Design a protein with these regions (language model features):
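Conserved Class I S-adenosyl-L-methionine-dependent methyltransferase catalytic core
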Residues: 13-53, 66, 72-191
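Alpha-helical subdomain
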Residues: 2-91, 192-336
């Protein structure tokens, strides 16, 4: 696969910040958990939407009639929202949605991340310190004390957590699938693709719809293969989709490789460095000389925007505290 242009991070961007701005930012950081929970309630109870729908602003007494809260509770939410620049008050005492509030309410990426942090990560992140010290996903116990990693149990998560997990996982990969497929199809022209760690089969489906001659095999844990098969039960694309249950850490590829392309999308970030080295060696031994290994990963130091770098780096805390205890989103240097 082609490597994206490397956008260097600007590590000195905040070195010249004033003391006043620095302490203000510090206060925002330490109170950010409270702001986050406030935002979730405002979104979940449609309060931001009610304010947005009133183009000329809305008075407190009119807004309270639309909510489930009394004047005390609503006042708390609105006070924080104003202080955090999510909404603002005009000179007539009417509430309006700010530009920040607009994106919190309407931006799909932001809403997906909000639900993921709330339903998958938030409670578990209280165990971050223990997870970092032990290299175990101590926050996972909030779902089930006996689980060792999250992956075999995705189908067992509470509904809101399961939906949030898959929405988050799919959003940051699905947006790249078609572009990646076009590159693969035009430059490699494969006939058979192995999608290792294929999850629910979205990459496979996208490729099968794009190229009506391609064949795809999804290889994943048994729990994930069950989900994939369920998603293809109404359309097997004339037999062009196949499935195989494997645990990549213990699987021995003894059969002859029929893959022209082996596809790993947001897969290596689920493993420790020593596991990654072992996986890649095993795949290299399995591949034909003309098989091409294609890897798609979010890389923090290749991002153009600060918010993207922050999102990816914070996502690595999920891997430590919730997913497995030992993996992370990889840097350019680590991949090389």
């Amino acid at each position: 696969m082609r490597m994206l242009k490397h956008h260097k991070t600007n590590s000195s961007c905040n070195r010249n910040i004033s003391a006043f701005d620095a302490i203000s930012k510090s206060q925002e950081i330490v109170y950010s958990p409270m702001i986050f929970q406030t935002v979730y309630v405002l979104v979940n109870h449609n309060i931001l939407k009610f304010i947005e729908d009133c183009k000329n602003g809305i008075a407190f007494n009119d807004l309270i009639k639309k909510t489930d809260f009394n004047d005390y509770a609503l006042g708390l939410l609105l006070d924080v929202a104003v202080s955090a620049s999510i909404i603002y008050l005009d000179d007539n005492g009417l509430y309006h949605l700010s530009k920040i509030g607009y994106f919190l309410q309407n931006d799909r990426m932001t809403r997906i991340s909000l639900d993921f942090v709330k339903h998958v990560c938030y409670r578990g992140l209280d165990s971050l310190e223990d997870s970092l010290l032990t290299l175990e996903p101590c926050g996972l116990k909030d779902f089930n004390k006996s689980w060792q990693t999250i992956y075999p149990h995705l189908s067992e998560l509470p509904t809101n957590a399961q939906q949030a997990w898959f929405a988050w996982d799919h959003f940051y990969s699905q947006t790249s699938f078609l572009n990646a497929i076009k590159i693969i199809d035009s430059s490699i022209k494969p006939r058979m693709v192995y999608d290792i760690g294929g999850n629910t089969g979205d990459f496979a489906r996208t490729y099968l719809q794009y190229n009506h001659n391609i064949k795809v095999k999804i290889l994943d844990l048994p729990s994930q293969i069950r989900l994939s098969k369920e998603n293809f039960k109404d359309n097997n694309y004339n037999g062009r989709i196949d499935f195989e249950e494997i645990d990549i850490l213990t699987h021995s590829f003894t059969e002859k490789c029929s893959a022209d392309v082996i596809w790993l999308s947001q897969f290596l970030d689920c493993f420790a460095k020593e596991h990654i080295a072992m996986i890649l060696k095993n795949l290299n031994d399995f591949m034909r000389d003309d098989t091409v290994l294609c890897i798609l990963e979010p890389i923090a130091d290749r991002q153009k925007f600060d918010a993207a770098r922050l999102s990816i780096n914070c996502g690595s805390l999920y891997f430590n505290t919730i997913a497995n205890g030992y993996s992370k989103f990889l840097s350019t240097k680590e991949l090389e």
